Amino acid sequence: MSEYPKKRKRKTLHPSRYSDSSGISRIADGVSGIFSDHCYSVCSMRQPDLKYFDNKDDDSDPETANDLPKFTDGTKARSRSQSCLVPSPVLRILEHTVFSTEKPADVEICDEECGSPESGHQHTHEESPIEVHTSEDVPIAVEVHAISEDYDIEAENNSSESLLDQTDEEPPAKLCKILDKSQASNVTAQQKWPLLRANSSGLYKCELCEFNSKYFSDLKQHVILKHKRTDSNVCRVCKESFSTNMLLIEHAKLHEEDPYICKYCDYKTVIFENLSQHIADTHFSDHLYWCEQCDVQFSSSSELYLHFQEHSRDEQYLCQFCEHETGDPEDLHSHVVNEHARRLIELSDKCGSGGHGQCSLLSKITFDKCKNFFVCQVCGFRSRLHTNVNRHVAIEHTKIFPHVCDDCGKGFSSMLEYCKHLNSHLSEGIYLCQYCEYSTGQIEDLKIHLDFKHSADLPHKCSDCLMRFGNERELISHLPVHETT
């Protein structure tokens, strides 16, 4: 006879019961009407709802080591704190069933057939058998190898907490200690990071934005990088930083009394000279553009161009040759050039813009019969269409433009070119009024502005410079500045 018994092939009409997701296998054949007739391997079964706290026959406790009963093979029974948890349906079956301590032959064959590496570490002869407590609190040592066919597989997905609620027994003390430690660690993390909480989907979501992640470390890094304020003690008005919040509060009281506010930013000051210097250095350090209609200043030509368009919306321009009306001077000029080019040339000659007498510009338009072209004799422009040559002369040689510079008299057909031209006059110098936002490129214009705009509130004028003062005492204190120079 061989050392190992011959393996018996299992035949069944239900192969799915041999999968790893099945329950616990049968333990005895003598009970009919409760268990299935098939034999299942307990070694290959996954039991996610059973949490083992196995101490491997821990005899360290002298009080309980000698009181525990022993089995026929010399294995000690486990105490209540060492017992394992099994599903409640199995407990209800086992409470009303009497089992024999002898191991049936079917179970031996089943144990021999289980040779999977997954089950090798779960149940061996050296391990203690699973202990199941009945309602009478008597430890009965049995090996659980069977499960009822009526057992619901969904019960396997229940957590260990729900299994504890189903049983009338108190949970083991060791399990309570483990849960307390995990809860304590979670509370500590939530206290440190109150905004980081896992939602129902298992994702950690930031309460300050839409960011979410399944990792706590990613959300923690996101909060530090995106929402943690490192410059909390910085003044919003003057951008000055302070070491404490109390110093920032004391500093903020100074800005409540600031009478001078920059219209281009949030800068405030109690000294007007500081405001004037701030405007010149910050907003008009390189270029200065101002509107001649309302004296509003801009730091770029594009801003001035947009500002001019606002003025053009309020005004309506009427064509003098027809009833065309528009709010944009460029649109009016384009209309006159395209529709009334010949009449515009005649008007230019009458005003002497051409410089060669009446109809001088019209006489410059000739027709080349050899090449069948209309040619401009002023610049050589040519085209097969007479209207194209008339449009060219009206645009380039009539010197009638929608925008004309007041300083040099040069005209421009587009507002953007006109705004860029204003930069050429800034080389002579920029003169800013120290008492308001007025600026000009001519020193005489600034003097006239000071005499008319600030003579009432600042009647005392310095004879050596353009400074004005509200009282005579301030003027006297200012005069030593010129004596030292």
UniProtKB/Swiss-Prot annotation:
GO terms for cellular component: nucleoplasm; nucleus. A zinc finger (C2H2-type) spans 204-227, 233-255, 260-283, 289-311, 374-397, 403-425, 431-454, 460-482. SMART domains: ZnF_C2H2. GO terms for molecular function: DNA-binding transcription activator activity, RNA polymerase II-specific; DNA-binding transcription factor activity; RNA polymerase II cis-regulatory region sequence-specific DNA binding; transcription cis-regulatory region binding; zinc ion binding. It holds the Pfam family zf-C2H2. Transmembrane segments: none annotated. Residues 371-455 are annotated as: Interaction with CTNNA2. GO terms for biological process: negative regulation by host of viral transcription; negative regulation of DNA-templated transcription; positive regulation by host of viral transcription; positive regulation of cell growth; positive regulation of transcription by RNA polymerase II; regulation of transcription by RNA polymerase II; symbiont entry into host cell. Interacts with CTNNA2. This is Zinc finger protein 639. It comes from Rattus norvegicus (Rat).
